[in-house]
């Protein structure tokens, strides 16, 4: 379900009336934000709402709004490594990604499991460049939790969300994606 949701993030952003024309490279949904699953058959609006209604935006509407940030290729590799190394022990940290693929060896040392990581735009494999900025979409809660990576790793790992110009983001509410003046 998380993979479908991350694909839906990309679709929602790139098909919004206020789309800025900058394609989404990666969309991320941590499993801890997915609240329900679906049984085979028809799916109701209520079921969709229940599966993903965590939080509330500044606009008072249930569900965290989407944010747009930029991470370097090196930071995306770090995110893949965190997913491969930590998510078996902390299942709420499992990342479901659209646009980011990686291969890992579960028998390798923690934080050294990923053997290959790259972008996949649906038509081709794109190698990550360590210093290049890539557009990442996630929900507000996930963005706010990124500082936990640095804290929990005692500074060994770092993911610093940035604006398109590389300036670190101080307030994630400044990067909420909107459509017609409403949070997306």
Sequence positions of predicted segments:
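Long, compositionally biased interface segments
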Residues: 160-184
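Solvent-exposed loop/linker segments at secondary-structure transitions
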Residues: 1-161
